[in-house]
Amino acid sequence: MVPQALLFVPLLVFPLCFGKFPIYTIPDKLGPWSPIDIHHLSCPNNLVVEDEGCTNLSGFSYMELKVGYILAIKVNGFTCTGVVTEAETYTNFVGYVTTTFKRKHFRPTPDACRAAYNWKMAGDPRYEESLHNPYPDYRWLRTVKTTKESLVIISPSVADLDPYDRSLHSRVFPSGKCSGVAVSSTYCSTNHDYTIWMPENPRLGMSCDIFTNSRGKRASKGSETCGFVDERGLYKSLKGACKLKLCGVLGLRLMDGTWVSMQTSNETKWCPPDKLVNLHDFRSDEIEHLVVEELVRKREECLDALESIMTTKSVSFRRLSHLRKLVPGFGKAYTIFNKTLMEADAHYKSVRTWNEILPSKGCLRVGGRCHPHVNGVFFNGIILGPDGNVLIPEMQSSLLQQHMELLESSVIPLVHPLADPSTVFKDGDEAEDFVEVHLPDVHNQVSGVDLGLPNWGKYVLLSAGALTALMLIIFLMTCCRRVNRSEPTQHNLRGTGREVSVTPQSGKIISSWESHKSGGETRL
């Protein structure tokens, strides 16, 4: 029952293209009333739209949309951001190496991004190694820069594929839309200049897998095709249908919002831009599940009410409300006038809000005007209350509307960092914060003494340094000893070098040096 009911859901949820659940159905055309017996009462068949009455049936094959596609086709993808990590080292005189890391961006190529994505998905260690910081090179008393390019893959990044023009829609795209994905160009630009978006499956056309093959019976009247009976046994009318391509496949959009790849000999016009197909998303599937349960419950209530009428031989306004047709199309309307059960042919339409049929107090709008009542009685259990307000039994229950509002408020989508409108990008090509979380931390590093020599070279250098230090110590000690020896000698010379004067016979005072000299000369 449920799989079949899913296929007539578009009949009930005809206004789903507008995003609202039809809370009621009411006749927009109402035929003349005629008296009937209670044995003529019947529960409506909500699985069939009684329409043109074509009788000539012939088998044919067609394609229709898979159950579950109503709003958008999800395309799994990923973003690829190019990052350049730069390591700048400086080695000072004594061998201390200071390393400073910086990150910038570059625009990656699609081929490189595809290879990096395949590495990541396959668990290839080359992807993780590509994200590591570069091993810095260094030279004594020089500044050396070492750079390394990395590709940061962030997934998933889901985009919506528009089946009408095969464009992609996501908030990660600059204008929310990407139309350039094709065989020759398999990527989209994003809000970030150095990030591109690519589909996980390089064959984007495979994402448009929304059709299923079915067999049915074409219904025609003479040479004119009126509609068809699908493989579930449901009749679909072609009245009001228009031509529409989905994912490049030509078909017909029916009045109930469904689509079939059916060709007719009639001259059918192309659909205007506002004529869309009811494409399902997960939220709509949940709502349709509730709709199916509600229809099954309503069917059981109708049968119970009909059984009660037949058993008790009495009819009430409340019981007549269960006999109302729940989907748009032709059906019956029932009422009680002057204690007489009445029936009329009716064509039902969907109602999205109560204001459509209750524009003012005491007015029930049918066919564009206020419908007259008979002693406060309308039809299908609708009556005029003592206070002058129109009372509709179904207005007392808004279960489905509450379910829909609950579903709408409970959707929490997964947001890609670039899809967040509050994201503020840095000026220039400095690395953004959203890629930093996917890369190792960078910070300044200062190494120990390292001159870049091999192990034997280090030992030779240490030995030469120790020998030089020893020679310097010996030299300093030798200098100190010489200084200490010269100081006592100078002190003794200063102690015996006092001036001595003598008085010669001539009475002239001469110095001792002159006296010694003249004495020597005398001796000579």
Swiss-Prot record:
One Gene Ontology CC term in the entry: virion membrane
Transmembrane portions of the chain: 460-480
Disulfide bonds: 43-302, 54-226, 80-113, 178-188, 208-247, 242-271, 363-370
Membrane-related topology note: Single-pass type I membrane protein
Chief location of this protein within or outside the cell: virion
Outcome of substituting residue 75 to M: In strain: Isolate SAD1-3670 var 1 and Isolate SAD1-3670 var 2
Gene3D superfamilies per the UniProt record, alphabetical: 2.30.29.130
Known uses: Primary surface antigen capable of inducing and reacting with virus-neutralizing antibodies. Almost all human and veterinary vaccines are based on the functional aspects of the G protein.
PTM (free text): Glycosylated and palmitoylated by host. Glycosylation is crucial for glycoprotein export at the cell surface.
Lipidation, S-palmitoyl cysteine type: 480
Intervals, Virion surface compartment: 20-459
General remark: Arg-352 is highly involved in rabies virus pathogenicity. Its mutation dramatically attenuates the virus.
The name this protein goes by in its record: Glycoprotein
Organism: Rabies virus (strain SAD B19)
Gene: G
